């Protein structure tokens, strides 16, 4: 969700400002209008209601916003383009989004799609100071990216980290972001559903996604979804809308996933995944051949898969292609697609042992593999 610059809103504000000025001019030119004439009966004066105290819920929401808004940043993404006639390079806005301060070392977390294709990224803090940012690491499969700015620790307020495992449908949530370029906009809602799946830019499935009805619009991408205590529970990433504007269904990558990925991106610049060291036949081909499971295309030399004797596809002496082993389960959990296999791997870390169940011809076999780091 990329937002456009808020020029329309500015021009509307000016229009309404001008209209208000003109509507006041008659009163300025005719000061007697509305003033009681001498000797006439006094006109009733409207009574202004006394201010009422805010409810405890309102006070709590205000306190959360005041505390968390300092962690939320505005991200502008620009790219360089060459004029086809003059061959001069010039900057073109790619859009804008939201992010939040992760650490006092200047790490900023946002969505990968917010900074995709950027040649230059500008981060604006809550105090309006601007910094050029560099990309430290990105994981397109989970739509997460980490930036870094050179700002003093005193100016950075990291967001408070919560957890997403204990979330309940119906609990209150708050979203802070920059929809349509309108910075630090607060919206509230509830957790509408848990355990949703969405597709990332790389067409990978993101599991365990939070669904919310807190308004999320273009420009909110990469912003924090908070619980009622102001703790981060997700990163706003997508909406379902036929018009492109909010229609009551928004999605956030759960914080437990983010909290696993971000330290890896800061340390390595990419997500180090556990795996078997194999390449796989696309799901579409497996379905076409009527295969249920994931077909191994090639086994890497010295890989975890080779060490347990898994076979890839091979050409027979007669020139016929023989399918590789078909992975059908990991630790007893069925595997029917590449996404299923990768999701199973992501539940573990490098060095963990997993039980691989696979089919070879008419035989069903099992082996225990020690997971290795893979790209």
Residue ranges and their predicted role:
Residues 1-12:
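N-terminal secretory signal peptides that target proteins for export/translocation
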Residues 17-31:
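Bacterial N-terminal signal peptides
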Residues 36-289, 298-301, 319, 338-342, ...:
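Serine-dependent protease modules
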Residues 87-89, 295, 308-314:
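Short, solvent-exposed beta-edge and connector elements
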Residues 108-109, 307-338:
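Conserved PDZ fold ligand-binding element
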């Amino acid at each position: 969700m990329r937002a456009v610059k808020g020029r329309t809103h500015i021009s509307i504000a000016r229009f309404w400002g001008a209209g208000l000025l003109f509507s006041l001019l008659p009163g300025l030119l005719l000061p007697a209008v509305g003033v009681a004439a001498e000797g006439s009966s006094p006109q009733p004066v409207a009574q202004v209601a006394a201010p009422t105290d805010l409810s405890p819920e309102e006070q709590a929401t205000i306190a959360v916003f005041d505390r968390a808004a300092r962690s939320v940043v505005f991200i502008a993404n620009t790219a360089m383009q060459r004029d086809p006639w003059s061959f001069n390079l010039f900057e073109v806005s790619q859009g804008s989004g939201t992010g939040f301060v992760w650490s006092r070392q200047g790490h900023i977390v946002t969505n990968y799609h917010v900074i995709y294709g950027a040649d230059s990224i500008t981060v604006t803090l809550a105090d309006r100071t601007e910094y050029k940012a560099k990309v430290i690491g990105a994981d397109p499969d989970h739509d997460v990216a980490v930036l870094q700015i050179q700002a003093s620790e005193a100016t950075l307020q990291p967001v408070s980290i919560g957890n997403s495992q204990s979330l309940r449908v119906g609990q209150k949530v708050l979203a802070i972001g920059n929809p349509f370029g309108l910075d630090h906009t607060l919206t509230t809602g509830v957790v509408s559903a848990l355990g949703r799946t969405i597709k990332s830019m790389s067409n990978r499935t993101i599991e365990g996604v939070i669904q919310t009805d807190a308004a999320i619009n273009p420009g909110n991408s990469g912003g924090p979804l908070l619980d009622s205590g102001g703790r981060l529970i997700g990163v706003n990433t997508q909406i379902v809308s036929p018009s492109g504007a909010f229609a009551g269904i928004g999605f956030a990558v759960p914080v437990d996933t983010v909290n696993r990925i971000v330290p890896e991106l800061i340390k390595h610049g990419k997500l180090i995944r556990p795996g078997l060291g194999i390449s796989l036949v696309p799901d579409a081909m497996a379905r076409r051949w009527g295969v249920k499971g994931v077909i191994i295309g090639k086994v890497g030399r010295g890989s975890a898969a080779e060490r347990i004797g898994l076979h890839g596809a091979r050409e027979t002496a007669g020139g016929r292609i023989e399918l590789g082993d078909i992975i059908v389960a990991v630790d007893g959990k069925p595997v029917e697609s590449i996404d299923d296999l990768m999701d199973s791997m992501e539940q573990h870390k490098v060095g963990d042992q997993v039980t691989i169940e696979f089919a070879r011809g008419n035989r069903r076999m099992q082996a225990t593999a020690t997971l290795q780091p893979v790209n």
